Design a protein with these regions (language model features):
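Mono-ADP-ribosyltransferase
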Residues: 1-224
Length: 224
């Protein structure tokens, strides 16, 4: 007879899913960087952003070889908060450098490789590194997230290109692959202490992203 899961663990899983799914939206980051997707983004693995990740909610047919599609309920929508014409036109958003993602899918079609990342809370990283967490996510969402995201690329490949999202400045901001350093190596998975010079922008991004829940911080650094 299987041992029942402890109630405390069940509550933690539920809290994690409530951080991930309600309000979850898709964000896009297109790049022509040299990426070994099979090596760097193994389905089921967990990665840390490593730097502030600029993304957009405005995307149609990609003109680049790679597209990161990120499911997140805690992305800072800069275009709604900063009176900057470029940010508004690009629908620019950003994710904190201590954001963690589970690699859900790598899908290639018509020369474009799409990498699906799901934003997860820091304290749940050990659980989401396990094999059975994938089915847990799919079950909790009551839908097939991978199918939805693959269909997104299928549909967008039939659309026109948004001219705004092909501007050189935006593409440069999105060039660096998520979770990789300048040499193409994975950034450390360890939570990075906030350098003093980045504290203000870090706090602003967290606030805009409604990302103050203690579940997304180390216990010694929790924001109540």
């Amino acid at each position: 007879m299987e041992k029942e899961m402890p109630q405390e663990l069940i509550r933690f899983f539920e809290k994690s899913i409530n951080w991930i799914l309600p309000g979850c939206q898709l964000f896009y980051r297109d790049t022509d960087a040299d990426i070994d997707a099979q090596k760097s983004y193994q389905v089921g693995s967990v990665i840390r952003a490593g730097f502030f990740i600029d993304v957009t909610v405005k995307a149609q047919r990609p003109t680049t070889k790679f597209r990161f599609i990120i499911g997140s309920a805690h992305c800072a929508k800069l275009y709604e908060a900063v009176p900057d014409a470029d940010m508004v036109r690009w629908r620019l958003c950003t994710l904190h450098f201590n954001s963690y993602f589970k690699v859900m899918d790598v899908y290639k079609k018509e020369g474009v490789t799409q990498i699906f990342l799901l934003h997860i809370p820091y304290q749940a990283v050990p659980f989401f590194m396990s094999e059975h967490s994938f089915n847990f996510i799919q079950g909790a969402s009551r839908t097939n997230l991978v199918e939805i995201v693959r269909r997104s690329l299928d549909e967008k490949l039939r659309m026109d290109v948004f001219a705004d999202t092909t501007e050189a400045e935006l593409l440069e901001r999105m060039k660096q692959p998520v979770g990789l350093d300048d040499k193409g190596n994975p950034v450390p998975l360890d939570y990075m202490p906030i350098p003093e010079e980045y504290k203000d922008i870090s706090d602003a991004v967290r606030s805009l992203a409604n990302d103050l829940d203690p579940i997304n911080y180390p216990e010694e650094d929790c924001h109540e």
